[in-house]
Amino acid sequence: MTNSYDKSYLKIALPAAFEGLFMILLASTDLIMVGTLGAFPIAAVSIFAQPRLVLLCFSRSLASSVTLLVSRKADEAGKEAASSIMKKSLTVCALLLGMLHILFFLFLEDILYLMGATPDYISLAMDYSVPALIATYFTSLTLILQAVQLGYGKTAVIMKTNVAGNIINVILNFILIFGIGPVPAMGVAGAAIGTVFATLFTLIATAAILRGDGFFAESSYVPDKDYFRQILPIFGSILSEQGSERAGMVIFSRMAAGLGPIPFAIHSVCMNICDIYWDFITGFGKASMVTAGQSCGRGSGRTAEVAAYSFFSVTLLRPIMTGLFLYGFGLGLTGVWMALVLDQMIRATCAIYFMRKLKARGWDRILADMA
């Protein structure tokens, strides 16, 4: 029988999980449209994935920090504090990501070559990556705004906004990739331009919803010492985990890209299929983070135990295993995926062991340490 803790958890988890599922299915439609143009266009679009995720690593870390802080204040009395955290984080994200995006733009071609791009499709990759950088910036700002909604458990609202934005993305991409009527066919550049407009829509829609909920009330956008005192310890720990995992994924993807455009295109399609499960289950991780954060604010050890979630990242192991299977045994793309399977098994084992150690310490004691 489902108890009240389970119902609260599922109310947050299911919309977040289905949002991830809808988003990856729509993204798959996107990849299918690009795929009709050939293997080189798939490789050109996919080679930008890791630079994009490196940029999002910073905004996601900040957004997760915002969610954890806001979830502890997730009631009407805490709305003013949540609003202040959101607005100051928006300023930090706009400035930090703005500088990073400028650096990426200035050295974009070198970055793509570093990621494993070849002269066969570098021009296509540049056509896609320049507008895709703009879309990534809009996504980063949206993540900060939606972090507040997530902190309040409003995953259904996030789902509706993101799915609407991605439907717009699919429609615009179809028009701009293939061309309809007076609109010329733009190929991979059209896919990126469609994403720019879709991400801008999601940003504006999210901001409008939060404004209607009163989160843009009178408070300063300028970060102060108190803000940094709250945010930096959380941001630093999350960024270290996110950054370590991203470094491992960059090396992993670079090895796959080094196999050539066609194997890399196949690898990218397979990764997209795997992301169907990954994006779905991530919704449950978000719900665990939110309910655990809310329970910390209430001092409820039991709720934290029900909502406990851990993500233990193994950074060095995957590239080492990938290099061994790829170069040592000469297994090619099969070796890349064998390394991925082993890595995920080890990560799951480590995460379970880590959670058992936390449980042995006692949740109430952990909450007291956090306080």
Q: Where are the model-predicted features located?
A:
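Short alpha-helical transmembrane segments in multi-pass integral membrane proteins
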Residues: M1-A16, V70-Y137, V183-L239, A292-S300, ...
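Transmembrane helical elements of multi-pass membrane transporters/channels
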Residues: K11-D30, P131, A135, G165, ...
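Hydrophobic transmembrane alpha-helices of multi-pass small-molecule transporters
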Residues: V54-C57, N169-N173, L203-A207, I276-D279, ...
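Helix-terminus/linker motif at the lipid-water interface of multi-pass membrane proteins
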Residues: L25-A43, L112-P119, I175-M186, G243-I276, ...
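Helix-loop-helix hairpin linking two adjacent transmembrane segments in secondary transporters
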Residues: A135-F138, Q146, L150, T155-L203
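Transmembrane alpha-helical core residues of multi-pass small-molecule transporters
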Residues: A49-R52, L96, T161-N169, G194-T202, ...
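Transmembrane alpha-helix boundary and packing residues in multipass membrane permease domains
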Residues: A16, G20, L31-I32, A49, ...
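Small-residue-rich hydrophobic transmembrane alpha-helices
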Residues: I42-I102, T139-I158, A257, I266-S310
